[in-house]
């Protein structure tokens, strides 16, 4: 009996000994217990996005899981909550998208990736250097530089993981609108002034009904907004010095300029102004001709405030115009006669004179003295801080829209440093055009239309009676209504039911519904929209480890995105891809994923 008890006691001691960890074992396990996980453990990646991008998020998740990651999706219902999560740093990867609305590659990278960019999470001296270098080069020169930029941004550092380049598509009710008058541009927002009804008799009796997703308008002051809530609206409310064609060529058509010219050295740019546009205002629900001409004084004022980050509180577009050194009115005709046009033997005067009914014989400083029919014109000279040919694209952007110096100064009397949104009402504040007790429309529009009023459901615009009257650019339709429909399926349903005439942004997976509808036409073109994954560059493992970022990068299989979207996407390497053919391509490689993950675990 004693022998049995002794045996049981010994067994119990052995069992207990096996359950107790030694000091060395505890220390050993503690060293391997970090945020990376063990060598054989899966690395967790948190992917942030919105419900509208759930299909993309699911594809990304599946690709990462397939390559050995443990994936957590952080899906937010709207842009506001998405931004809050992003600002709080609650992500490793953020599903992001960017559309280069100016049609030039500098815009595709400066705000996103330069250290001081308004939307940048990247702080890399080499990236900064390459962005600045490319900006001074012409289209014939900058391809190599942008290729080097992509190599640093994606290949070497993996700050982003590209997914695809989208097409641009809109549905048009061809039974109501004349489809030939509806433009679909690669970059710029849709221009309303060219659109016409199939039955021209409806021009003054019925509104053109369009749609946009966001009804909370950032600002109707061009320099205070650069997002989907106002890009189309401000584009149609404020004329600019130049415009973009549907293929992203800079032209003077439909702008405030007859012609423009670039001086030798690519730092001085001259614009010959028209005299047939007045500002419009609103009273009693109607648009009125103020009698105030849109002139060079307003251009200089608008561009000077556009480039000055302290011109207004919450200036959101100054980085687009920071390369402007000055804007001034030309007062000496000899300057135009003695300055050569870049790349030619022509003078600036000869270039500006091209195609005019009445040649330029005198430059005038005061806009009230301009009379183009007599040869008296205003000329504005824009000088950049360094050679910067792409400045013309920025001048075509809605943020370079021309506002009335007199009107804006009369409203913006507050002190910028002590601005208080609760008591100070700045020019372009949406509260002034929103139906209700605070309605007090003080807008002055230089473009083809002016916003009369808005509510939670729509915004109503009226034709500017003093915009290019009698010319081909006079707006065809008198009234435009923009419905606020944030869901793409609901917008498509409204188009199919005839509630709206135009839907810009038809989802790729719904093209067939538009194409099969007897009353609709699908317009489709290339676009500058790129969707990509933005890595968190602060406070996460992906922030510290290039190896981990590269493991994620080579997990991305773009072919699977193209297949899901039935070929209605294209491959991309960065936000530059739609604009410059660098030859770079992302190829998924599971062996590289394994290699970089192993290197990460050894760090």
Segments the model singles out, each with a brief description of its role:
Residues 24-27, 228, 232-235, 246-247, ...:
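Gly/Pro-rich hinge or "lid" segments in bacterial periplasmic/extracellular proteins
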Residues 72-82, 107-176, 204, 550, ...:
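Extracytoplasmic/peripheral linker and loop segments enriched in polar/acidic and small residues
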Residues 45-48, 136-158, 297, 377-381, ...:
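Alpha-helical secondary-structure segments
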Residues 70, 437, 466-513:
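Ligand-site clamp/hinge motif
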Residues 259-336, 369-370, 375-381, 542-544, ...:
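Aromatic- and charge-enriched surface segment that lines or borders ligand/interaction sites
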Residues 210-264:
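N-terminal lobe/hinge region of extracytoplasmic solute-binding protein
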Residues 311-425:
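Surface-exposed binding/hinge segments that line
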């Amino acid at each position: 009996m004693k022998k049995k008890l002794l045996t049981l006691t010994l067994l119990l001691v052995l069992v207990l000994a096996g359950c107790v960890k030694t000091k060395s074992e505890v220390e050993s396990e503690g060293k391997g217990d970090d945020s990376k996980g063990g060598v054989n453990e899966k690395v967790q990646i948190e992917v942030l996005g919105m419900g509208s991008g759930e299909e993309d998020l699911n594809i990304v998740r599946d690709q990462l899981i397939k390559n050995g990651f443990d994936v957590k999706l952080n899906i937010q219902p709207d842009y506001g909550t998405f931004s809050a999560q992003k600002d709080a740093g609650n992500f490793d990867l953020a599903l992001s998208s960017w559309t280069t609305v100016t049609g030039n590659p500098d815009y595709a990278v400066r705000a996103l990736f330069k250290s001081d960019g308004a939307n940048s999470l990247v702080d890399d001296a080499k990236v900064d250097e390459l962005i600045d270098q490319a900006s001074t080069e012409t289209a014939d020169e900058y391809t190599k530089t942008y290729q080097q930029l992509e190599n640093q941004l994606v290949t070497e550092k993996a700050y982003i993981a590209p997914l695809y380049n989208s097409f641009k598509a809109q549905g048009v009710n061809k039974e109501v609108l004349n489809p030939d008058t509806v433009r679909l541009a690669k970059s710029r927002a849709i221009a309303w002034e060219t659109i016409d009804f199939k039955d021209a008799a409806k021009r003054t009796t019925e509104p053109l009904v369009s749609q946009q997703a966001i009804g909370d308008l950032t600002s109707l002051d061009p320099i205070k907004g650069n997002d989907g809530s106002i890009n189309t609206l401000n584009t149609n409310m404020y004329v600019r010095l130049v415009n973009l064609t549907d293929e992203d060529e800079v032209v003077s058509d439909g702008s405030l300029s007859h012609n423009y010219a670039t001086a030798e050295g690519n730092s001085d740019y001259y614009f010959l102004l028209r005299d047939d546009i007045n500002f419009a205002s609103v009273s009693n629900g109607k648009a009125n001709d103020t009698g105030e001409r849109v002139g060079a004084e307003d251009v200089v004022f608008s561009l000077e405030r556009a480039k000055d980050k302290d011109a207004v509180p919450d200036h959101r577009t100054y980085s687009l115009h920071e390369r402007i050194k000055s804007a001034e009115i030309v007062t000496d005709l000899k300057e135009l006669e003695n300055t050569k046009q870049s790349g030619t033997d022509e003078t600036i005067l000869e270039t500006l004179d091209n195609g005019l009914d009445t040649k330029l014989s005198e430059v005038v400083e005061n806009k009230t003295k301009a009379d183009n029919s007599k040869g008296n014109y205003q000329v504005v000279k824009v000088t950049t801080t360094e050679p910067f040919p792409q400045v013309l694209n920025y001048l075509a952007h809605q943020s370079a829209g021309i506002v009335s110096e007199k009107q804006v100064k009369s409203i913006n009397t507050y002190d910028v440093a002590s601005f208080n949104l609760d008591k100070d009402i700045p020019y372009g504040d949406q509260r002034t055009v929103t139906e209700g007790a605070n309605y007090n429309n003080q807008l002055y529009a230089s473009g083809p239309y002016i916003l009369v009023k808005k509510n939670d459901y729509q915004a109503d615009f009226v034709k500017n009676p003093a915009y290019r009257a009698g010319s081909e650019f006079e707006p065809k339709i008198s009234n435009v209504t923009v419905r606020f429909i944030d869901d793409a399926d609901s917008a498509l349903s409204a188009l199919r039911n005839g509630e709206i005439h135009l839907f810009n942004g038809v989802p790729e997976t719904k093209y067939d519904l538009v194409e099969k509808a007897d009353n609709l036409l699908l317009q489709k073109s290339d676009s500058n929209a790129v969707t990509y994954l933005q890595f968190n560059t602060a406070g996460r493992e992906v922030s510290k480890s290039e190896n981990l970022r590269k493991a994620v990068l080579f997990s991305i299989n773009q072919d699977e995105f193209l297949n899901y979207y039935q070929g209605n996407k294209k491959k991309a390497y960065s936000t530059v891809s739609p604009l410059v053919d660098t030859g770079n391509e992302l190829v998924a490689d599971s062996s590289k994923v394994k290699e970089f993950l192993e290197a990460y675990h050894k760090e």
